[in-house]
Curated annotation (Swiss-Prot):
Organism whose genome encodes this protein: Streptococcus pyogenes serotype M1
Record family assignment: Belongs to the bacterial ribosomal protein bS16 family.
UniProt gene name: rpsP
Keyword Ribonucleoprotein: yes
GO biological process: translation
Protein name per Swiss-Prot or TrEMBL: Small ribosomal subunit protein bS16
Higher taxonomy: Bacteria, Bacillati, Bacillota, Bacilli, Lactobacillales
Pfam families found in the cross-reference section: Ribosomal_S16 (PF00886)
GO molecular function: structural constituent of ribosome
Length: 90
């Protein structure tokens, strides 16, 4: 089972916010997911982001592939740098 970390759209028309979910790559965008690991609100001035870093790092170490947008969000939050250090510190 190929697992991806991607955004799921929530909210109402013209006012979206997103959940950062871990899901099977074959599942629909807003369909079944395994776990919610964060949220992202692009409408707030500072792009409010909440992330469960320990869970994201665990899923990345298990081989989950982040989507391009989620990779950018995680990079801005500093999670990808921690994952890189954790991966190559062995």
């Amino acid at each position: 089972m190929a697992v991806k970390i991607r955004l799921t759209r929530m909210g109402s028309k013209k006012k979206p916010f997103y959940r950062i979910n871990v899901a099977d790559s074959r599942a629909p965008r807003d369909g079944r997911f395994i776990e919610t690991v964060g949220t992202y609100n692009p409408l707030v001035a500072e792009n409010q982001i909440t992330i469960k870093e320990d869970r994201v790092l665990e899923w990345l170490s298990k081989g989950a592939q982040p989507s391009d947008t989620v990779r950018n969000i995680l990079s801005k939050a500093g999670v990808m740098a921690k994952f890189h250090d954790q991966k190559f510190s062995k």
